[in-house]
Amino acid sequence: LGDKKLDHSEFENFKDFYTSDWQRFVEYNIHDVNLVDSLEDKMKLIELAVTMAYDAKVNLEDVYSQVRMWDTMIFSDLKGRNIVVPPRITTKKDDKYAGAYVKEPIPGSYDWVVSFDLNSLYPHLIMQYNISPETLLDERHPSATVDRILDEEITFDGDCCVCANGAQYRKDILGFLPQMMQRIYDERTIYKKRMLAAKQNLEDATTPAETLALQKDVSKFNNIQMARKIQLNSAYGAIGNQYFRYYNLANAEAITLSGQVSIRWIQNKMNAYLNKILRTTDADYVIAADTDSIYLNLGPFVHEVFKGREKSDESIVGFLDKVCQVEFE
């Protein structure tokens, strides 16, 4: 904002401030309110919270609770299909389950590091494996592990989806969680495209009225797509919470371990590709990885491509941007 709170450091405490300089104390509080109002104009956080509450049909304070928000969203979805939600059962989270994959960073100083992340990883895993309370089978796969799946030691020929923790899910019906994930993701995609289009049009606006209208469109569409993004990303937090009506450790671990498979598979493929391009053997170009992101050392790649040629930072950035979009993505 380029602004800050009014200074009152000469007073020992707020009581001293209040009693010694009443007029300045009033101005201080008015300025604080104006700062909050300016922050809201710029950040739209209150508007975002209202959007989330309205969309999920919850009270405003409930948007800070993943469990309550998702419980209400699922209730509304199932009610619309004439499905009665199950009663809440008290559960204890005595057993720990595996979390996300984090690769120990390779220490060093690197030039030309790029990062990639898997788009909405956990929601997509829920859709990919049809992870949902009513699709989970009682029978577990006897030998499924992250390493065995990555090493292709297991074949999946059955009529169910198999996750890395051995949890198996029906294929003959589509679970309500994957359906909701798909709908929310599709809606987010639509409004994100509208936001980007409005931003593009804003750059070409010629009148104050047009500029104001487009600014409102950007804010509106951004709030809607951001609300959908938060809903998607908070789903796993609810699924792994023992107080969630649909909590099941198998579902939570199916998501995290399948996420490990995905990010490690991407890591292996990136290393294999760069080893082939640079004619190296078993070199590790992924210097760090965490949950759904990898950090790739493209310094050797840049050195090989620009060897003996004049180069500038701008030309390298432009080249890497194109290569990352065309080859790696």
Regions found by a protein language model. Give the residues of each.
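Metal-dependent DNA phosphodiester-chemistry modules and their immediately adjacent helices/loops
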Residues: 1-9
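Short, surface-exposed recognition loops or helix-turn segments adjacent to catalytic cores
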Residues: 8-14, 279-280
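Intrinsically disordered, low-complexity segments enriched in polar/charged residues with Gly/Pro
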Residues: 12-15, 87-90, 100-102, 154-156, ...
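Conserved catalytic core of nucleic-acid polymerases
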Residues: 118-121, 128-132, 140-329
